[in-house]
């Protein structure tokens, strides 16, 4: 590598610890994992961190309904989440929880730094209170009639019918979603983070050129309309961290959740002698920090989070990498339509590399939604991975193994074609780095077409019938194996399981920097099936789960 080695910290948004991982979640974790694996292949020092977001009223109420304490519930869900991510070959260096000593200490320290600098304000607010559950109701736990358009059955913060936003205390005829009781209005003293004080810094960040254009434009809209102080308080009963010197007051989950990136990394660093937490989080750091997130949480990550970090003397993210939503067969994931697919149900029936490939073939650096069309999914995986890539190895390896004891030719049959494949590596590398994964896949599949055309034109099955052409047969089939090796090297960030099986077959590690040299006079292993075609019956079985 000519590029200097970078130190990079990468995170995904923290999954909420009140339910299973589904294929919508997996888009982000697969996108980030492909980028991380590519950066590692190029020699960079990358740490890939995540955790469960384990606080909040929703978790407290679900645990109560399940008859267990919240700590036990989040521990069980954390293990399920880790199993799902491991099943999809997400290469986390560390996966933790926001309900940790490290996160508590960092949350308190950040709050105290903000308070010392005058960035924490205090005032009384009016909230809806459930008199039966003795609970202040979050916006999502109360429904009523929209005060703007009179649409019934709307949540306490915004109307899905007319798009208006409002305070829950403005709802007409509100009802608690927890108990069904009619809530009453009560006052409570809350702490606020003075977000407007950071308008200048956030404006500079928007115009730095680092952020995705769509993100910068959205931030500009929010800044133009004016920022408001952010309520970081929740009242007891609540599952989270208590605010120092404020009895019965807790940090709002959206304060300690992003601090969970730091808490998870701190726990990781404390177990490693050669990784420094401060090096990655101090304000003058030379390291890079990237957050992969969905478009639904841009507001928190582009405004609140960098302002909190700035105000507490920690570094800000180098960039936010934002993606869109997943639809299935053109519509929102739905339990009633059978398209709400849990990660664990997918893994019971299908290879994780199939979904990794399909998402990769559609992902870009933009914030567009991606459709998981199950018919197209089957067709594309079978056509690209089975027919084009794996078949390239199979149709050539049979001759090499049978006639030449697994030894590749001493000479390169077509050096011009070989170096066409090598030179394509720069375009593919640039696409991976820029998160234009679909562009990388298009480039790779165009090469796969070239490789198969070469084999078709050389017709080794015809050469095999002419004993005088054995040297040419070995050379042609070896060329097919060389091209398969390059293709699999380029696909390695996307297809870790298939890459590992391919490395065993090729009897060599797939590294980006080694493809300049073909495997001349090299012994390959006997060919075994590398990848199975997707059967429609497996899709049907998965949807029935």
Swiss-Prot record:
Organism placement in taxonomy: Bacteria, Pseudomonadati, Pseudomonadota, Gammaproteobacteria, Enterobacterales
State the family named in the UniProt similarity comment for this chain.
Belongs to the class-I aminoacyl-tRNA synthetase family. MetG type 1 subfamily.
Which Gene Ontology BP annotations are present?
methionyl-tRNA aminoacylation
UniProt entry tagged with the keyword ATP-binding: yes
Indicate which residues the UniProt annotation says bind ATP.
335
Binding residues annotated for Zn(2+), in chain numbering: 146, 149, 159, 162
Give the first-level EC class, as a single word.
ligase
Q: What is this protein called?
A: Methionine--tRNA ligase
InterPro entries in the record, alphabetically? aa-tRNA-synth_I_CS, Anticodon_Met, Met-tRNA_ligase_1, Met-tRNA_synth, Methionyl/Leucyl_tRNA_Synth, MetRS_core, MetRS_Zn, Rossmann-like_a/b/a_fold
- Write down the chemical reaction(s) this protein catalyses: tRNA(Met) + L-methionine + ATP = L-methionyl-tRNA(Met) + AMP + diphosphate
Any single GO molecular-function term of the entry would be: methionine-tRNA ligase activity
- Source organism per UniProt: Hamiltonella defensa subsp. Acyrthosiphon pisum (strain 5AT)
| Documented EC number(s) | 6.1.1.10
């Amino acid at each position: 590598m000519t590029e200097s080695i970078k130190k990079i910290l990468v995170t995904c948004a923290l999954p909420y610890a009140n339910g299973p991982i589904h294929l919508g979640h997996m888009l982000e974790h697969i996108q980030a994992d492909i980028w991380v694996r590519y950066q590692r292949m190029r020699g960079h020092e990358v740490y890939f961190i995540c955790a469960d977001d384990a606080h909040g009223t929703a978790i407290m109420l679900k645990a109560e309904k399940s008859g267990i304490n919240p700590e036990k519930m989040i521990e069980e869900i954390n293990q399920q989440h880790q199993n799902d991510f491991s099943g999809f070959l997400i290469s986390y260096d560390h996966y933790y929880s926001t309900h940790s000593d490290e996160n508590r200490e960092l949350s308190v320290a950040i709050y105290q730094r903000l308070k010392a600098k005058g960035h924490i304000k205090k005032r009384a607010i009016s909230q809806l209170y459930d008199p039966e559950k003795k609970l202040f109701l979050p916006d999502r736990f109360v429904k009523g009639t929209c005060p703007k358009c009179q649409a019934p059955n709307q949540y306490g913060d915004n109307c899905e019918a007319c798009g208006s936003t409002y305070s829950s205390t403005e709802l007409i005829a509100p009802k608690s979603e927890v108990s069904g009781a009619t809530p009453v209005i009560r006052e409570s003293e809350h702490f606020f983070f003075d977000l407007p004080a950071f308008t200048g810094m956030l404006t500079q960040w928007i115009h730095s050129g680092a952020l995705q254009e769509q993100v910068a434009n959205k931030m500009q809209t929010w800044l133009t309309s004016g920022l408001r102080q952010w309520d970081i308080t929740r009242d007891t009963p609540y599952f989270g961290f208590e605010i120092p010197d404020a009895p019965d007051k807790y940090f709002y989950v959206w304060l300690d959740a992003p601090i969970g990136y730091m808490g998870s990394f701190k726990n990781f660093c404390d177990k490693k002698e050669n990784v420094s937490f401060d090096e990655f989080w101090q304000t003058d750091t030379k390291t890079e920090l990237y957050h992969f997130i969905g478009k639904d949480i841009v507001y928190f990550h582009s405004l609140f989070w960098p302002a909190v970090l700035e105000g507490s003397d920690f570094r800000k993210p180098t960039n936010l990498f934002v993606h869109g939503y997943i639809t299935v067969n053109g519509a929102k994931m739905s339990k009633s339509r059978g398209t709400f697919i849990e990660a664990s149900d997918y893994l019971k029936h299908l290879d994780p590399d199939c979904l990794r490939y399909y998402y990769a073939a559609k992902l870009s650096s933009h914030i567009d939604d991606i459709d998981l069309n199950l018919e197209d999914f089957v067709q594309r995986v079978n056509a690209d991975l089975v027919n084009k890539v794996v078949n390239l190895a199979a149709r050539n390896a049979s001759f090499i193994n049978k006639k030449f004891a697994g030894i590749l030719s001493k000479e390169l049959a077509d050096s011009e074609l070989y170096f066409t494949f090598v030179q394509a590596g720069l375009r593919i590398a640039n696409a991976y780095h820029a998160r234009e994964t679909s562009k990388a896949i298009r480039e790779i599949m165009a090469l796969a077409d070239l490789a198969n055309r070469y084999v078709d034109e050389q017709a080794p099955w015809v050469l095999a019938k002419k004993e005088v052409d054995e040297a040419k047969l070995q050379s042609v089939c070896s060329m097919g194996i060389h091209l398969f090796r390059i293709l699999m090297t380029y696909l390695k960030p996307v297809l870790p399981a298939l890459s590992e099986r391919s490395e065993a077959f090729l009897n060599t590690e797939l590294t980006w920097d080694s493809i300049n040299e073909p495997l001349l006079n090299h012994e390959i292993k006997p060919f075994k099936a590398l990848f199975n075609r997707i059967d429609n019956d497996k899709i049907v079985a998965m949807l029935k789960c």
